[in-house]
């Protein structure tokens, strides 16, 4: 059965002639003793798929009685450590931890919440919610409820539920109907009916929404983006705009996030690590293409000029090449 975490446009694939015991031993040697063989760690962990890394984690635990992630944490530091630990974490657990981190401490990282919840499939969201409960003994919905409010909270909870339709079939009649409902809920009334926007944008399939947005333009003579900007505000507006952008082109949406993470003073390694790791087996090749198309230079060169050391080497290996 194909994994729900693997697509066809990733940069990282299964390693041929894979042996978890050989890799576990090589990693243990790289970590043990004085000094760490970072090159060895990087070459093994970036050249294996996540499913293969999970087998290495199991083998490592069986052979040495330790958690590989704990040994990596004890031996490495900074951004490089965060990235290597991310690589050995199962995808659903990784996303669950990213969501928790987005809501922990003072202030909520709404951008991260929006990015994760708008780009994961319904089946992935179900896995993430389960992982969240397993790790934190609290439901993802409860934490979202206590950290956010209003229409933004309502929409996030709908997405976190993993109830978006995923069929590829489109229904023209429904698209016309939904476009009409959105028009009446926003442009064509005094005040906005936010619930209608949430219901349609958070539950319909992406192909269905694409058609709905076309119908919307026919009815209103406006793009849905302009209507959302004119009718809504705050994080709720940001969330709905993110959904529209993902419906139209998810790799372009994520390329824009990476561009923001790498632009200006300092690097947003939280976002950079998350997108590079979580999309490395799904659509990172497409994200690279969109990045080059929109910004005139490659993602590879952006990483190269903005990061350094083993952290840079690892990111470039995940990136998988220059464009």
Curated annotation (Swiss-Prot):
Modified residues (Phosphothreonine): 267
Example of a GO MF term: calcium-dependent phospholipid binding
Acetylation in keyword set: yes
Annexin repeats: 18-89, 90-161, 173-245, 249-320
Chain positions with N-acetylalanine modification: 2
Pfam family membership, one: Annexin
Keyword Cytoplasm belongs to the record: no
One GO CC term on file: vesicle membrane
GO biological process, one term: positive regulation of endothelial cell migration
UniProtKB keywords: Acetylation, Annexin, Calcium, Calcium/phospholipid-binding, Phospholipase A2 inhibitor, Phosphoprotein, Repeat
Domain notes per entry: A pair of annexin repeats may form one binding site for calcium and phospholipid.
Family: Belongs to the annexin family.
Function: Inhibitor of phospholipase A2, also possesses anti-coagulant properties. Also cleaves the cyclic bond of inositol 1,2-cyclic phosphate to form inositol 1-phosphate.
Protein name: Annexin A3
Gene that this polypeptide is encoded by: ANXA3
């Amino acid at each position: 059965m194909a994994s729900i975490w693997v697509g066809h446009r990733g940069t990282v694939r299964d390693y041929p002639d894979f042996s978890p015991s050989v890799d576990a031993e090589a990693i243990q040697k790289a970590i043990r003793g004085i000094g760490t063989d970072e090159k060895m760690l990087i070459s093994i962990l970036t050249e294996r798929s996540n499913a293969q890394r999970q087998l290495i984690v199991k083998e490592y635990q069986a052979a040495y009685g330790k958690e590989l992630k704990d040994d990596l944490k004890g031996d490495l530091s900074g951004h490089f450590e965060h990235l290597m630990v991310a690589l050995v974490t199962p995808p659903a657990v990784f996303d669950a931890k990213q969501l928790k981190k987005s809501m922990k401490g003072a202030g909520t990282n709404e951008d991260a919440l929006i990015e994760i919840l708008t780009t994961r499939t319904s089946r992935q969201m179900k896995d993430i919610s389960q992982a969240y409960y397993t790790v934190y003994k609290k439901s993802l919905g409860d934490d979202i409820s206590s950290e956010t409010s209003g229409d933004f909270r309502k929409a996030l909870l709908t997405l976190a539920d993993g109830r978006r339709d995923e069929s590829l079939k489109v229904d023209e009649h429904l698209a016309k109907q939904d476009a009409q409902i959105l028009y009446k809920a926003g442009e064509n009334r005094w005040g906005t009916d936010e619930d209608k926007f949430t219901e349609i944008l958070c539950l319909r399939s992406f192909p269905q929404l694409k058609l709905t947005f076309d119908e919307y333009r026919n009815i209103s003579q406006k793009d849905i983006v302009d209507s959302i900007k004119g009718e809504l505000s705050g994080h709720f507006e940001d969330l709905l705009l993110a959904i529209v952008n993902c419906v139209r082109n998810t790799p372009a949406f994520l390329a824009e996030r990476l561009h923001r993470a790498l632009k200006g003073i300092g690097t947003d390694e939280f976002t950079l690590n998350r997108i590079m790791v979580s999309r490395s087996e799904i659509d990172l090749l497409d994200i690279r293409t969109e990045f080059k198309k929109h910004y005139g230079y490659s993602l590879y060169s952006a990483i190269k000029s903005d990061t350094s050391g083993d952290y840079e080497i690892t990111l470039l290996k995940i990136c998988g090449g220059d464009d």
